[in-house]
Amino acid sequence: MTGTPSAPTTSPDDQADGPGEGTVDRQPYRELGLTDDEYERIVATLGRVPTDAELAMYSVMWSEHCSYKSSKVHLRQFRDTPATDRLLVGMGENAGVVDVGEGLAVTFKVESHNHPSFVEPYQGAATGVGGIVRDILTMGARPIGILDPLRFGAADAPDTARVLPGVVAGIGGYGNCLGLPTIGGEVVFDPVYGGNPLVNALCVGVMPVGRVQTSAATGVGNAVVLLGAKTGRDGIGGVSVLASATFDEGGGPARRPSVQVGDPFTEKILIECCLELFDRGLVTGIQDLGGAGLTCALTETTAAGIATGQPGGMEVDLDLVPLREASMAAHEVLASESQERMLAIVTPDALPEVLALAERWGVIATNIGTVTDSGRLVVRWHGEVVVDVPPGSLADDGPVYERPLRRPADLDLLRADAPSALERPRTGDALRATLLRMIASPNLCSRAWVTEQYDRYVQANTVLAQPEDAGVLRLSASGLGIALATDGNGRYARLDPFAGAQLALAEACRNVTAAGAEPIAVTNCLNFGSPEDPEVMWQFAQACAGLADACRRLGLPVTGGNVSFYNQTGSAPIHPTPVVGVLGLFDDVTRRTPIGFTDEGDALLLLGDTRDEFGGSEWAWATHGHLGGTPPAVDLEREKLLGEILVGGSREGLLTAAHDLSEGGLAQALVESCLRGGHGARIELPAGADAFVELFSESAGRAVVAVPAAEQDRFARLCADRGLPCRQIGVVTDGEGGSLNVAGEFAIPLDELRAAHEGTLPRLFGRGA
């Protein structure tokens, strides 16, 4: 495999022709998603017409999914977010890495598998979990937990009954088999997601600080080793078709590719094999095979190696790749997205030990190539050179577009349609009926039907899990631990994408701090419609600007993330849906704060200000089908202060429960905390206050906490000294025959609340979880 490669095999006519009508018929680049300009750029880069294999490689690597060609100009501002002392690896690698102390580092990232999960819900969701787990593994970490932010069409829509059970079963089936607890996430229903469900997955892992891996292929003469499953035709076109194209009005892509097929057992042994390789220091570089398969792994590792300044390049023989189907062509082998595969760079001295270790684990390991100093990626197939390209042209130097932006034409009318004109409940009976209707609505009801299909406590390190505000994991015997939460609100972002992104970050931070953890890093998954629509791109630009601004003001680094475009059916895009994940840190997880009210007599305190804010609210949507107005105001300084008070109160042992207020307002939070802890609550609203606003407003920057009576004055002084509004709204009552009693308005027994809250999803999707 050494020496000067011959030119890739093409016909003399193809070599002579330049781009234009003469080559269009022979090279179907448009069908592969490339534009005329992009094709001409490829020809100019190579100085010739590309081979079929090269054309396939450029088509997937320059797809929206791989190249970020429409989003890159806006994502750059995330690099300006604070680089804290804890940040070890930021944007640019497979996942961000932060130092959490005690010689440990944590890596986490959220990605999407939206389009495959609509086509094949079970496999799409399962392989979405598998892919994000391998991203975490690639950094050198042991995966330890999963979160799954999900969005579906209307809860009673026929296709939701097809998609949701399959997605949930896929996540549970794959994650449970890997032995990974699913500790958090979201389930949201809205008709805009009917043809485009959002299946986002976050994984978190832990490792020794000194074991961080990189993807760079360096060291001339080092071996290129393919680990894991054999390569088949599953997933071919998954990137170039599914993640970079809209669905047609019939509910599917115009070109239907093969969705990847997952095997969690193979992934499990691959994880253990790779972790032992890392522990023994047997690899110099590592990359998972996900979107675009070998094409992406080979080009990214080679380009990363060259970027280090060391001599770099790679030669690969595809005949050595273990195949499931012997009839596959070169471009199919390169584009296959078969799951459970990794690419390792190994020194010649370590190669025998690597192969022996893989054999012991039952993992297929094959030396398929060599690191060179040619500066090029050369691929042979049946003895002929089919690829000879500069790897950076694929991995780093693809097209970058500054697409036109246009404020949505209907936005002013949408914002002017404020919910203030909607009929509001004014009597105690009407408030009672509204509360019962709200807590039974698809977006506010219990998620137990979903979460009970996941193993939330496997590995015995889960401290808190759904339905808590954040998932909490123990990292060491000392009590060191982390909290994770994901949040997003498409309705808020539809009304104001800048504020909507900031509200998503603010809520994720509140969830983490309500559990008692200090936020230290952010990841994001940006789900939007077609980038070819100027109105969608305006929404995207606004959301990026809002999120970057909020991260800077809160002092949080963005460690990485994902962009998912083309989430629309025909000309109808989804709501702009930035999903934000926040990582928090505990010194001692035994000091975590749950949401449940458990101690009779505890004072219930409301932190923050309540305003008449119902734009984009769950009340307006669930009771009136209304979307309009402006979302709640976001005050990032207040959010930061609230978080500091919640974390401080937790560490000082002043809180027995804490719950952030978001969708559904105070009423929803009280119901969830009462049911979680099995105790009632007696609430007294301020004299002369509007009971409806007090109970259902979605004002941001608020939380309800339970404080032992003996600590109430101390906690109130803590809030007063820092300038955080704090007022007592009630007390926790007994658990036997308890109720949620709002003085002067209504009382609802816990049993009635539980029946309303827990019955919706089983009724819609079946009793068997």
UniProtKB/Swiss-Prot annotation:
Molecular function GO labels: ATP binding; magnesium ion binding; phosphoribosylformylglycinamidine synthase activity
Subcellular localization(s) per the UniProt record: Cytoplasm
Example of a GO biological process term: 'de novo' IMP biosynthetic process
Binding site for Mg(2+) 2: 135, 288
Record region (Disordered): 1-30
Function: Part of the phosphoribosylformylglycinamidine synthase complex involved in the purines biosynthetic pathway. Catalyzes the ATP-dependent conversion of formylglycinamide ribonucleotide (FGAR) and glutamine to yield formylglycinamidine ribonucleotide (FGAM) and glutamate. The FGAM synthase complex is composed of three subunits. PurQ produces an ammonia molecule by converting glutamine to glutamate. PurL transfers the ammonia molecule to FGAR to form FGAM in an ATP-dependent manner.
Protein name: Phosphoribosylformylglycinamidine synthase subunit PurL
Designated gene of the protein: purL
